[in-house]
Amino acid sequence: MTLEQGIVLGVIVGIFGLFAWGKWRYDIVAVIGLFSLVVADVIVVKVLRREDSALIDPESALAGFGHPAVITVAAVLVISRALRNSGVVDLITRQLAPFAKNQTLHIASLCVVAAVLSAFMNNVGALALLLPVALKTASEHGRSPSLILMPLAFASILGGMITMIGTPPNIIISTFRDEYLQTLADQPEAAAYLDKIGGVPDSFGMFAFAPVGGLVALLGVVFVTVIGWRLIPKDSLKSAGKDEMFALKEYITEVRVPEECSFIGMTLGEVEKDTGEKMMIFGFIKKDGKVMTPNRNNLVRAGSRYLVKVDPVDLKAIMDQSGLRLEKELRSRIDNIEGEDVNFTEVVVTPNSQLVGRSRAFLRSRTSNSVVLMAVARQGQPIQKRLGDVEFRVGDVLLLQGVQDNIEEHAASLHLLPLAEREVRVGIFSKITIAVAIFVAAILLSMFKIMPTTLSFLGAILAYVFLGILPLRDLYREIDWPVIVLLGAMIPVSGALQSTGLTGEIATAVNNLTESMPAWSIVALLMVVTMCLSDVINNAATALIMAPIGVGIALQMGVSPDPFLMAVAVGASCAFLTPIGHQCNALILGPGGYRFGAYWRMGLPLEILIVIGSVPWILKFFPF
């Protein structure tokens, strides 16, 4: 192994380690990796005097941000917003009501719609649109939302595999394949290999992934609809019913004990028993604001302040009955809200929200104190801090109080998803027709190779803007900028894998270890390894690292790279074991009331089924 190869391997291992650690967001980690390569290249060239360094060219280190894959991912997100604005999605979801009477049909109808929508728009956006619909219909029919939301999230992920634009890994695989094969065509020494695989094959089109991705989506949707939801742990199921449609029973808020409170003189244990265990007191707030764990035998005294875990509906009843009050600062902020339409709204922190990693102070500054944070609910890990010290995470459910118009405005600007019954907004029929026609035209231009996918989608965006379907204020709102930065930074890192020859070294090692194994098993192994990585790090980063390795293995074996690239595409999109593996999984964590360990119960059998079902299908449509 050369010095350059060792450096690239060290950087990639470091990137994977930082991804798994989770201290910094994935886009920051990707930039750290890119910058590390640039610094290493400067040292190798300027200090070690190795002018032939193949690490990375510092002058073109940022070229990844102009890569077609990056532009295509951003364009798909913008088009998703335009389709939502036109009313197309709402028109589809309005047809789901008749199917909600039967539980299996209820789950199946939501999952099918989610999968179809995710094939043509961002899967997180599709899930966000269907989440309120799922919660509303589950409540109306007395079903636990936990039985609905995990199948719905998994179906959104599965649907993205059907088309080239459905998920970032497919876009990455498609563009990487074109660039790699073109590079080979320019190398005389690769002529024998190209002749063996039948020359340079055509580019992957819009539906090139459909034979495999469609089967995976079909298998997955049938599984989660018929079997999967039955595997969700019973202790993860939220109670059902209209009164608790969106209410989580683990909200954290602050209360104080006034002079007239009936709890004075009782022990904390007696207070919890008196409330029917509906309120758990888990923190005592000292005068300096610090929180300590209280003794259950401590007596309640006037003026004491506590952190409690309680359902908001139960808290109101307890306050009315006992005289318990909200903490003074919280109460004063509520009293300062003016307006007749003051109410409570529950919102979920989405992956794109500016609140992620921020505290209540940031929320107050962004909303000009027009919205009050009443409580926070988080699944998996208890919150042992005061509300002002809590750092928000993806999937947290926030209970906000304020004027309804203010809450809706700030929820939209901060990318918070309201968990409230919403009226289905049906766009003007002509706008729906035009929006669909423009999108279909863009796809046809790409399918028939009249125009590259990236440019045809940019043309569609311009049409949406000119026709008023996509207001300028919404133009960049839906773009997932951390993913864009991740892709732009990781593409040069992926290129360094190839330019230093490290992919060849890894491929040789793999072939030596698997020389006695049949070729199909190597495809399956590559898929499984990719799946494992995708469960703990971003799927786009996984595809960028594993695609060159898959191609290197194919080159060593002297076979077509397509089955290996398809295995990477499928594996990178299958992140079903943890809530951190995919943004869709994180989005339902709070509303579904799931624990961290609930995902693998359904996700592991699903991933096994996908490997068993997809490998033969890959080899049928993409033979060696």
Task: Locate predicted features.
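Cytosolic Rossmann-like ligand/nucleotide-binding regulatory domains
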Residues: 22, 264-312, 358, 364-401
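Alpha-helical transmembrane segments of multi-pass membrane proteins
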Residues: 104-116, 143-159, 188-209, 519-532, ...
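Long, charged amphipathic helices and adjacent flexible linkers at domain junctions
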Residues: 235-255, 320-350, 417-443
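Transmembrane alpha-helix interface/packing and boundary motifs in multi-pass membrane proteins
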Residues: 15-24, 113-122, 154-165, 444-450, ...
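Hydrophobic mid-bilayer segments of alpha-helices in multi-pass membrane transport proteins
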Residues: 4-16, 23-54, 66-78, 129, ...
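Extended, hydrophilic extramembrane loops/domains of integral membrane proteins
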Residues: 391-424
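Membrane-core helix-loop-helix motifs of multi-pass transport proteins
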Residues: 140-230, 585-617
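Membrane-embedded alpha-helical segments and adjacent helix-loop junctions characteristic
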Residues: 45-144, 221-225, 229, 471-557
